[in-house]
UniProtKB/Swiss-Prot annotation:
Name used for this protein in its record: Small ribosomal subunit protein bS21
Ranges of biased composition (kind: Basic residues): 43-64
Assigned protein family: Belongs to the bacterial ribosomal protein bS21 family.
First and last residue of the signal peptide: none
GO biological process terms, semicolon-separated: translation
Taxon lineage: Bacteria, Pseudomonadati, Myxococcota, Myxococcia, Myxococcales
Gene3D superfamilies documented for this protein: Ribosomal protein S8
UniProt entry keywords in alphabetical sequence: Ribonucleoprotein, Ribosomal protein
Cellular component GO terms, alphabetical: ribonucleoprotein complex; ribosome
GO MF term set: structural constituent of ribosome
Amino acid sequence: MPGIRVKEGESIESALKRFKKATEKAGILSEIRKREHYEKPSVKRKKKALAAKKRAVKKARKSF
């Protein structure tokens, strides 16, 4: 988990902003949302295949 040290004279708002940026960069919030509910392995496979298909279509469209 990312941690920050509050600098001397730094406001709480700016420290909170740095912390939010660090957690977003580490992908913690997206990981929490992903693990919030159980997802069956078959559903995971379908989502993964759909994402791969979208990437392929996007790549093919970009090459033209």
